[in-house]
UniProtKB/Swiss-Prot annotation:
Protein name according to UniProt: Large ribosomal subunit protein uL10
Family: Belongs to the universal ribosomal protein uL10 family.
InterPro entries the record matches: Ribosomal_uL10 (IPR001790), Ribosomal_uL10-like_sf (IPR043141), Ribosomal_uL10_bac (IPR022973), Ribosomal_uL10_bac_type (IPR047865)
Gene Ontology cellular-component annotations: ribonucleoprotein complex; ribosome
UniProt-listed SUPFAM superfamilies: Ribosomal protein L10-like
Annotated GO MF terms: large ribosomal subunit rRNA binding
Subunit structure: Part of the ribosomal stalk of the 50S ribosomal subunit. The N-terminus interacts with L11 and the large rRNA to form the base of the stalk. The C-terminus forms an elongated spine to which L12 dimers bind in a sequential fashion forming a multimeric L10(L12)X complex.
Length: 166
């Protein structure tokens, strides 16, 4: 009987870790990796590491306990088969975007669900999130839109200067 307690304590510790990761992550993606090779999984982990994204594999039963604690039970229906959990702490769409892009090249990986801004999302919704531009892209678009009027003014000034020189 005493040998069961350490195993139970270890599982409770893992559940607490999962709860903490989901709470602290801006975005979480859940994907099935059933037929992914070791090389493909290593490649996914390398790509994630470059982007500051964490890739973890947990037993679905432990994730079920964690999502129940977080009132995200809508995710339970996606916790079947072999799942990989991808956590993005810096960019809310980073995890979904990474998995969606990787799945385009590796059909063995299937984006199933996720958590975005603290809400559970089904497959269609998380795929929609994955198509959104990243934070860096949005900053670039914003800066470009701010600079556009300035460029127009500079073009007019240059045109006037050119006509005066002629």
């Amino acid at each position: 009987m005493s040998t069961n307690r350490p195993a139970h304590a270890k599982k409770a510790e893992i559940v607490a870790e999962i709860v903490s990761k989901i709470q602290s992550a801006q975005g979480v993606a859940i994907a099935e990796y059933k037929h992914l090779t070791v090389e493909q999984m290593s490649n996914l982990r390398r790509q994630a590491l470059k982007q500051g994204i964490e890739v973890k594999i947990y037993k679905d039963s432990l994730v079920r306990r964690a999502v129940e604690e977080l009132n995200l039970t809508e995710l339970n229906e996606y916790l079947t088969q072999q799942n990989v959990f991808v956590f993005s702490n810096d960019d809310a769409i980073g995890a979904a975007k990474l998995v969606a892009n990787f799945a385009k090249e590796n059909e063995a990986l299937k984006l199933k669900a996720g958590v975005y801004e603290g809400a559970a999302m089904d497959t269609a919704a998380i795929m929609e999130v994955a198509t959104l531009p990243s934070k860096e892209d949005l900053y670039s678009m914003f800066a470009s839109s701010l600079l556009y009027p300035l460029r127009q003014v500079m073009a007019v000034i240059n045109a006037v200067a050119d006509t005066k020189q002629d």
